[in-house]
UniProtKB/Swiss-Prot annotation:
Species, as recorded: Bacillus subtilis (strain 168)
Annotated Gene Ontology cellular component terms: cytoplasm
Protein name: Epoxyqueuosine reductase
HEAT-like PBS-type repeats: 333-357
EC id: 1.17.99.6
Residues where [4Fe-4S] cluster 1 binds: 188, 191, 194, 247
SMART domains linked: EZ_HEAT
Catalytic activity: epoxyqueuosine(34) in tRNA + AH2 = queuosine(34) in tRNA + A + H2O
Residues the record lists as binding [4Fe-4S] cluster 2: 198, 214, 240, 243
Length: 386
């Protein structure tokens, strides 16, 4: 088997099936990543969504015996939405991050990886592979960086010269000894715009993220959102793009190369109030094909409530009151009560008191009390201004 020729053939085949960038690296242990992960774990900075076994995250040969190399791929996704609908005072909208526009990228990249695997295995019967995207054991970003796809920027995103950081990543471990590519140089320079712009200070240092403070992570949690973050997520329903949109290296980067990644504006920027009463079936039918649906409707509904509070949308108060009184989920009842207080209409004070009297869940009860205090504070402020 001529490995050099096979590499060139694989590169050409990858282009033909719509892979925007491909790179190669060894299957050696990711030693520097191991040190970083141990540090992040000790600081409590991990999200909890990662593979818990650090050795598996840094040792490809634990995942594929006799592994010799890793093939990394990247697909560029759009950064701008065509005909994006606007929020109005009576029809407020939320936003899904760009990585949740169009068809779930996990499915898109798995399809590409399957084709690449089949291509290689058609060349020789002894070829072995193991592929993964996002939810696999390896760090997609660490592999992509070492394979020369892009460099790891201060916002922790893999940034490519061609497409900026608007790329999806995946990789395939193989027993073929492909010649590794050369990593590219860091292009951040002295710029710190991403660190300065992060709404929650999650980027604690250049290249170091406290995932527990990252809005992208927080929008995916299912419990009560900590108080300090509630006013910072704005109208984000899933994910956050701030550290990407402020990056100078992303300026002018907007690629519409894959039709399946094009966003439906009514899904990527949905109306908020209809989300409050959406059924499981309706949610699955409308949002089930996008990556932002993977945690179910509860986090999206909670975030929609917080977004309505962010807008101080008084037109949503009847729906929020209905949730506070009747929703079976304490997180939704409590968050709705907090939002009612945040919106600040004194006419709803009695509804909050009624809810507090009958509420049995201690956490939800605490949120109702917060709503009452917010409403009182709002009334005092209005009196002071009058």
């Amino acid at each position: 088997m001529n490995v050099y020729q096979l590499k060139e053939e694989l590169i050409e085949y990858a282009k033909s099936i719509g892979v925007d960038k491909i790179g190669f690296t060894t299957a050696d242990t990711f030693d520097s990543l191991k040190d970083r992960l141990i540090l992040q774990e000790s600081l409590g900075y991990l999200s909890g969504f990662e593979e818990p076994d650090i050795e598996k995250r840094v040792t490809p040969k634990l995942l594929l015996p006799k592994a010799k190399s890793i093939v990394a791929i990247a697909l560029a996704y759009p950064s701008r939405m065509k005909d994006a609908p606007r929020s109005t005072r009576t029809e407020r909208r939320g936003i899904f991050c760009r990585a949740s526009w169009g068809k779930d990228y996990h499915d898109v990249l798995r399809e590409k990886l399957d084709l690449l695997e089949d291509f290689l295995k058609s060349k020789h019967e002894d070829i072995r592979t193991k592929s993964m995207v996002d939810t696999g054991e390896l760090s997609d970003r660490a592999v992509a960086e070492r394979a020369g796809i892009g460099f790891s920027a201060k916002n922790c995103m893999i940034t490519t010269p061609e497409y900026g950081s608007y790329v999806y990543l995946a990789e395939m471990i193989t027993n073929i000894p492909f010649e590794p590519d050369v990593p590219i140089e860091d292009m951040c320079g002295s710029c710190t715009k991403c660190l300065d712009a992060c709404p929650t200070g999650a980027l604690v240092n250049p290249g170091q993220l406290n995932a527990q403070r990252c809005i992208s992570f927080l929008t995916q949690t299912k419990g009560f959102l900590p108080d300090e973050f509630r006013t910072k997520i704005g109208n984000r329903l899933y994910g956050c793009d701030t550290c990407q949109t402020v990056c100078p290296l992303n300026k002018g980067k907007d690629f519409h190369l894959h039709p399946e990644m094009e966003p439906d504006p009514e899904i990527a920027k949905p109306l908020l109030k209809p989300l409050l009463a959406i059924s499981n079936r309706e949610f699955k039918e409308k949002f089930g094909h996008v990556s932002g649906s993977w945690r179910g409707k509860k986090p999206i509904q909670r975030n929609a409530i917080l977004a309505l509070a962010h807008f101080k949308d008084a037109s949503a108060l009847p729906e929020l009151t209905e949730l506070m009184h009747k929703d079976p989920r304490p997180v939704i009842r409590g968050t709705a009560a907090w939002a009612i207080g945040k919106i600040g209409d004194p006419a709803y004070a009695e509804e909050l008191e009624k809810a507090l009297e009958k509420e049995k869940d201690e956490e939800a009860k605490l949120e109702i009390e917060k709503g009452i205090e917010l409403l009182k504070a709002s009334g005092m402020t209005k009196q002071g201004l009058s």
